[in-house]
Regions:
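Thiamine diphosphate
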Residues: 1-164
Length: 164
């Protein structure tokens, strides 16, 4: 059965939980992971790499993220209120297809729902990213991505918020 691992934290967690519910209503298993610090995960992983490089005769150290995700299956989607570069810093240690949504672009003054839709981190965009990742991974054949874009009411012709 297809499975999605959703990463979220802080105020975006509500969007991630709603996306999980929407995925599960479609028969797609979804686990939610609370990421309190992408920077700390990155630093820990880099420290382990350094240790392993400098101590080749010692037992290798495993990064915390590898310990947590090492046995997980499925695809991974990170949704963040920060730029995509922040969650992307842990990409080398993600054991599957990894899709990142973030708020790249210039600031706007709007209500949260409008901003989340504008920056493509709303539950609908998280669901789309998850199902697209499953389709790209060959794990899901029940819903075409183009049909889902239409169903979710996403305007695919809208400008990229990072460039708008």
């Amino acid at each position: 059965a297809p499975k999605v691992n959703l990463f979220g934290s802080g105020s975006i967690m509500t969007q991630v939980l709603e996306a999980r519910d929407q995925l599960e209503s479609r028969g797609i298993a979804a686990d939610v992971w609370s990421v309190t610090s992408y920077n700390e995960l990155y630093r820990n992983a880099m420290d382990c790499e350094r240790w392993n490089r400098l101590h080749p005769d010692s037992a290798p150290r495993r990064a915390y993220i590898d310990q947590m995700l090492g046995e997980e299956r499925g695809v991974y989607v990170a949704a963040s209120d920060y730029m995509k570069a922040l969650p992307n810093c842990i990409a080398p240690w993600i054991p599957g297809r990894f899709s990142v949504l973030g708020t790249d672009g210039f600031g706007l003054s709007e209500d949260r729902a409008t901003l989340r839709d504008y920056f493509e981190v709303s539950p609908q965009h998280i669901v789309l990213a998850a199902i697209k990742a499953l389709n790209d991974d060959g794990s899901n054949s029940t819903l075409a991505t183009d049909a889902l874009i239409h169903e979710l009411g996403i305007d695919a012709s809208r400008a990229n918020p990072a460039e708008a």
